[in-house]
């Protein structure tokens, strides 16, 4: 089991704060929701939709690999596995069985900034999803046997998904080289050594700090009655005690003053690849929308600049992708170009840099901006197609921006981005001094194969 503030009306109800959001008339399809904060700090977002007799429940914990300290990496992702190994009233494997036997699906995912757990179930099984998530938040079963079992599973996942995958080392190296702050330098899955060294006490302490109601957002979306659902949530989650606020991570990133570069000889890669990464401001920055439009102009679709020039005309690369990563930030604007057979990484890199310089100084056509706006509108629509995706987005906006209603302003915000905005962020951030380059070169495997 391995992904931008909004209008909010606030009024007090007993010990809770409840919010309701109305969509902007200019932002297209919107999500209606109510938001409540329980006395223990849990934020509860409910969105009613009777399109289908199902609902999705999402618990968004504000913990990711950025919260891990050196020597204890991989803990957030480890819990993505541990959280399905049983709690006080749910035995090992029973979480899966109860969900699947009642016609549901479930999963979890971890990134640098957050961990998600979610289920989609028939509407008549609302109590089940709430019960399962509350029980493991309250009383996760953390034992040596569970830890050893899931530690081995995660280590094998690392071997298969990173260590023995083409370009795996290169992908990990980009963050290691680009960042000075240790919070984002290491991979989400962690190191083998740190996973091996983790003790039950280490893991239990991490759980107590971060998997608490005051460090989480609960979103339930689908065929439900918000008033009835809120009372069920209060009953199940309301008595889980809050914990002291987790330590705040200093995300300050020193200004990079010179290009950083490394070559990786990869026995698993069949084609060379050039990766460039530029540091960009946090997702909460006013510049973030322009950075995203920049990525669309450079690489989204066959009409994009990279495709037309580097793939189609010059035939130097088989593919070129560009865009900002999902990190809250400071983030990375990444470019990944797979070198075409018979071409060189040097030629591809030169072509990429030439296109960046052309964008900075030359005109950006009106149709390119319009294309980015249309893509944003399409993303809004596709993001509303399932109760699960709506719930994930609601929780994400609440957590990242502390303004859930911003979810209904995405297309409207992109529509305000101008060509001048795009050229300004390109000139500001896509510079040689702010650049990290990782070049992957295929090489024959050593005798005996990859280890």
Report each predicted region and the residues it spans.
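Non-catalytic, conformational "gating/processing" segments within enzyme and secreted inhibitor domains
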Residues: 151-152, 204-236, 433-435
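Active-site His/Glu-centered metal-binding helix of metallohydrolases
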Residues: 75-83, 294
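M16 family metallopeptidases and their MPP-like homologs
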Residues: 47, 52-70, 74-78, 92-136, ...
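Positively charged n-region of N-terminal signal peptides that target proteins for export
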Residues: 1-8
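Short, polar/flexible loop-turn hinges at active-site or ligand-entry regions and domain interfaces
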Residues: 85-90, 137-145, 364
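Proteolytic maturation boundary segments
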Residues: 4, 13-44, 225-265, 273, ...
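Histidine-acidic residue clusters that define the catalytic metal-binding segment
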Residues: 26-36, 135, 157, 175-216, ...
């Amino acid at each position: 089991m391995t992904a931008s503030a909004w209008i909010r009306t606030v009024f007090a109800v007993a010990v809770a704060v409840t919010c309701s959001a109305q969509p902007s008339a200019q932002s297209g399809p919107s999500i209606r929701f109510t938001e409540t904060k329980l006395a223990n700090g849990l934020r509860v977002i409910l969105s009613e939709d009777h399109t289908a007799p199902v609902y999705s429940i999402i618990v968004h914990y504000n913990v990711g690999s950025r919260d891990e300290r050196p020597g204890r990496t991989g803990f957030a992702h480890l819990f993505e596995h541990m959280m399905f190994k049983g709690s006080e009233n749910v035995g090992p494997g029973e979480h899966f069985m109860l969900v699947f036997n009642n016609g549901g699906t479930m999963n979890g995912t971890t990134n640098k900034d957050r961990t998600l757990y979610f289920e989609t179930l028939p509407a008549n099984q609302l109590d089940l999803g709430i019960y399962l998530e509350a029980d493991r938040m309250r009383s996760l079963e953390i034992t040596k046997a569970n830890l050893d079992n899931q530690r081995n599973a995660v280590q094998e996942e690392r071997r298969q998904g990173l260590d023995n995958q083409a370009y795996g080392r290169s992908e990990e190296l980009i963050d290691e080289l680009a960042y000075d702050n240790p919070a984002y330098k290491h991979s989400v899955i962690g190191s083998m050594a740190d996973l091996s060294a983790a003790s039950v006490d280490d893991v239990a302490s991490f759980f107590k700090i971060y998997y608490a109601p005051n460090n989480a957002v609960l979103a339930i979306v689908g065929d439900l009655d918000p008033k009835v659902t809120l009372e069920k949530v209060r009953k199940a989650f309301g008595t889980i005690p809050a914990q002291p606020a987790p330590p705040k991570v200093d995300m300050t990133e020193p200004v990079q003053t010179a290009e950083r570069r490394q070559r990786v000889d990869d026995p698993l890669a069949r084609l060379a690849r050039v990766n460039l990464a530029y540091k960009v401001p946090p997702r909460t920055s006013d510049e973030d929308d322009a950075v995203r439009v920049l990525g669309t102009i450079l690489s989204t679709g066959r009409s994009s600049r990279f495709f037309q020039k580097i793939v189609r005309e010059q035939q130097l690369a088989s593919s070129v992708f560009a865009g900002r990563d999902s990190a809250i930030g400071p983030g990375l604007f990444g470019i990944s170009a797979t070198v075409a057979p018979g071409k060189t990484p040097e030629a591809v890199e030169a072509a990429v840099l030439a296109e960046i310089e052309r964008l900075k100084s030359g005109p950006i056509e009106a149709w390119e901006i319009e294309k980015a706006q249309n893509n944003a509108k399409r993303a809004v629509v596709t993001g509303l197609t399932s109760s699960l995706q709506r719930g994930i987005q609601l929780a994400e906006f609440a957590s990242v921006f502390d303004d859930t209603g911003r979810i209904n302003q995405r297309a409207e915000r992109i529509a305000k981005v101008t060509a001048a905005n795009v050229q300004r962020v390109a000139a500001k951030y896509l510079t040689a001094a702010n650049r990290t380059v990782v070049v992957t070169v295929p090489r024959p495997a050593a005798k005996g194969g990859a280890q």
